[in-house]
Amino acid sequence: MLPSFQIATAPQLRLQVEGDLCFDTVRAEHCDAGGLWARDVAPGSQLCIDLGKIGRADSAGLALLLHWLARAAQRKLTTRVESVPESLRGLARISEVEDWFDSDPSAGRRV
């Protein structure tokens, strides 16, 4: 199932991801997260990325998630990733990027 994205802005900026995040489904156009990066969002705002409705996930999904986190850091957003499936968490753990799922731009972490 191809991924789809829903963006909510109240009470906080929230990206709900649904579908599979794997080599078969992740495309370059998904880097824009359903138009999220075109929105005018103030630095310091919080972004929640909810992965509770994704199916399969592999390293392509992890790469996409890390891209989104890097984009959020560039815009100085505080990010939180919710409902990370164990398959994705395991890949993040062995890649030593699991701590990127909760980020604070003031912490000095380079994404």
Regions found by a protein language model. Name each.
Residues M1-A60, H67-V111:
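STAS-like cytosolic regulatory interaction modules
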